[in-house]
Amino acid sequence: MSENSQSSPFFGTESTLHPSLPLLSNSIQPAGTVCNFSRVSTPDVSSAWLLPSASSTSLQPLMGNAYLNPHAGTTMLTVLTEQGQISTSTPSYPGALKWDCTGSTHGREDALQEFNMKLIDQDTTLSSLAVTNQSDKILDPNVIVPFHPTLSSSFVQITPSQMPNQGYSLAPSYQEGSQVYYYEHNNLGPLIAGEFGQCLKAHGSVSYPGSQTSVLQPEMVMVLKEIQPRNIQMPLFTSAFSYSTSAQSMPDNGLPVVQMETSLGLPPSGQTHCQLQSPELCNTCVQVSQIRPPAVNGDKALTAPIHSPSEFLALPPAPSLEQPENKTMPEIKEGTKENQDRPVLTLEHPDLQQPLHCTDTESLRQKPDSDNAHLGCICMGPKELVGLENENGSSFNFKDITRLEADIQLPQLLNTLTDIDQDQSCETWTVTSGPSDQVRKNKHKSFELLEGAPQAKFQHWDLVEGEGAGGVAGASERAIDNMAKQPEGKAPKGPPSKNRKARKQEQERPSGPQNKSKKTEELKQSRNTAKAEENLSIPKTKRKRNPPELSQNSFKKPRTNLAMHMLESVQVFHPLGKKTEKKTGISSFRGLRTFTINKDPGPGSGTVTTTVLNMPCEGQFPPKSPGKVQRAESSIDKDCLSPSQYELPPAGKVKLVPLPFPTLDKPQSRPASRKPLSLALRRTTTVQPHSHSAQPTTLRPAQPPPVSSSLIASAKPAPPISSSSTGPNVTNPNQSSAVPHLVTSRPVPYRASSHTSFQRELVSAARNKVPSPPKPQTKYLLHDFSRQPIPWKKVDILGPVVSQPITKEQRPEREAMKRQAQQERENAVKNPSTGKLQIFLQRERDMEISQYYGYAM
């Protein structure tokens, strides 16, 4: 059936059912086939057209070239074609007529057919109507192809005097290659002339593969319901379509998109019902059905994709103005559920004021979870929508709801909505799942707008990372209880993703039970107990080998050696170390925290802040560290961290203030530190420390060398020097724990290659005490090859190198080596365990050789 074929329904009058017959107005003259109408009791493979009774109805011109001019006792069909006017006057036919169409044997898809439709009734006279149409399929004559046009979706003016509150129904089937709808007009009132227009648009068509006559095709039912808007007594139809199939199984089908646009500017009560009644329907792809009401009352549109053929999804309407028919909706719903296993046979319900397939908006909550197990969206009643709009003050977007994962059950979401309704502390709430940036921004915005004491606000960081508390502390006692109950990730929003769960477990692993007690103690203890709690927290933080701030940041601690190299090469702002209260100006993270947060500097904390806070100005960090510094400043102002923490604050939380410092030309050593250090550079940094004798004069006013040592130590997995180093005069025991990683061994300096300037400052601070390498990693010293020339740095090859053949004396040795290698391979194949051992032994030898020559493996 071609999509551009024009057709028009006409309406007859009967006490209960008032069907109509579509006509085709395209006029083409090829050789054609004959379509016969014969009276049958029930519709079989082909369509059933219910014809009107003896009463008459006067209708105006419909659409296109088709006119309906009925008179008393007859039904006149007038079709205007290019050849002329064809009029057919027939009496009423109260029965059902069978319409079969037989195509020609051979042809192409663009072939044309001419049809002669004959209306045959056994009790009345015979009349025929010749209609031509363009078809896109010509099938085998053995297969009876039901042929139906596409209905026009324009409503027409109807004379109200001759329509005494009677229902009208068009009952064709939904057949192959066509789109036909059922129409039911309950209490059809007058439409204003000239303002009718298209209220329904059928987009696309559904095409099925060639099916036999034994397979019953599905039906599409479009039920039109009347509402009475205010101030204007005119009906506006809102569609509710149900998709019912027969008991046969069929291939992949696609339900077309039906879009309803109200052109009269009246508020509809949009009901969209998608009912898939056959569980044998294999893969029914139901596209999105949209109802677009006008923006008069601000009603929001809902879209609902359905992916399971055994579901019944109902999107309840916006609250209409005058609907006294809502009393019968639960009864209709019960009748609908009983008829779900068989196709819709009739729409004959004279006593009901509602269409057959509809649902109650309030009973949607009481559906079991099994009905909603496969839903990709969430059905929400008008009360929830109105409540959310009143609370949010913003538009409720259904696209955010459709992004909810499928494992969220409907009663859980409704309980969440009621919790939100009760909680007056939150001003905005987004019911979405997934780590979208917009959701996080809305969360931060909602928590910033809260009123209360600054110590009552808990960290946003934990909320973003998945610990998710239900309310903000300090707003009410109930919010505090919710926050105490929900730090384990049981937030009312959707389930967190896997990486959030892993990140939460990793950051709770080192802290243990302190993480729960920390949040509650932050809310209840005042600032005057800061000093005692800090003294209690010092030994606990010293026992922690891996601080949890690495996991609280936006990255995880790398597990492989190569990942550690890459991480330290970009120098992502690590914690600065642990607190040591000594008399010299060692920069410790705890002392810096007491200075910036508690406003209670310890001994020597003035020099602490000046030395540490200037480090980003020297360019020791990558260019993205200023952004992290700004984020740290904003987060430190928002959060007001309580001093009663039992662990180090997260990385990036320190408020860094850039101070004026004379040595701003230090980043000149950065290009050498980005790549693996050459032997010449290592020779200058390790063997000749007196070359940096000019640096201590510029660096000594603020004394950053011990600061850099603590920074280097904190950047490593186990910081050894931050808790033991005392000042610029670094002693030999401290140097023995840190300097072998920085100076003597070859592979590890690559690991700390971004700290080249820190290493230089450390060596210049202890320039008179060149440390002897205590226990190097290999048995070969670094000084053995440090002064050797680098052959790949200079090109001294004059020509191509010609290899010399081995001599006769070397030949037996070479053959013996080959035989030994072959024997080793054979043994490895025969004995896998010894082969693996041999592989490890050989790799150990190779590692030793590579470490001797300075290659980090």
Curated annotation (Swiss-Prot):
Residue spans of biased composition, Polar residues class: 683-700, 726-738
Region spans: Disordered: 316-339, 484-561, 619-777, 809-836
Highest taxon listed in the record's lineage: Eukaryota
Xref: Pfam families: DUF4629
Compositional bias (Low complexity): 708-725
Biased composition (Basic and acidic residues): 324-339, 518-534, 630-640, 809-828
InterPro entries in alphabetical order: C2orf78-like, DUF4629
PANTHER family reported for this sequence: GENE 5591-RELATED (PTHR31466), MCG1026354, ISOFORM CRA_A-RELATED (PTHR31466:SF10)
UniProt-recorded name of the protein: Uncharacterized protein C2orf78 homolog
Organism classification: Eukaryota, Metazoa, Chordata, Craniata, Vertebrata
